[in-house]
Amino acid sequence: MPKARVTKNETAPVSSNPSANRTPVKINSAGTPMWYKVIMFAFMIVGLAWLIINYLVGPQIPFMADLGAWNYGIGFGLMIIGLLMTMGWR
């Protein structure tokens, strides 16, 4: 019977220690600072509050009435900033 082909992996020496073949990776366990989380959630909550206040009493508040439809851009913009900050949260 013909002999099967020998692959590269079969001829490579096998280490008795499986962790010897791995490259050590340094893990930063510090996480995100507290101020980052506070600002991130503050952006999202202030944006939501802006939209709710605009919907409920926007025409009665002079500067919000002057902004008109820009209130939606401000509210959603603040929430999007908070959402984008979640990508840096560890």
UniProtKB/Swiss-Prot annotation:
Any one GO CC term of the record: plasma membrane
Pfam families, per the entry: CrgA
Transmembrane segments: 38-58, 67-87
GO biological process terms held by the UniProt record: cell division
Membrane topology: Multi-pass membrane protein
Keywords: Cell cycle, Cell division, Cell membrane, Membrane, Transmembrane, Transmembrane helix
Subcellular location: Cell membrane
InterPro entries: CrgA
Compositional bias (Polar residues): 9-22
This protein's record includes keyword Membrane: yes
Region (Disordered): 1-25
Protein function: Involved in cell division.
Family label: Belongs to the CrgA family.
NCBIfam families to which the protein is assigned, alphabetical: PRK00159.1
Name under which the protein is recorded: Cell division protein CrgA
Lineage: Bacteria, Bacillati, Actinomycetota, Actinomycetes, Mycobacteriales
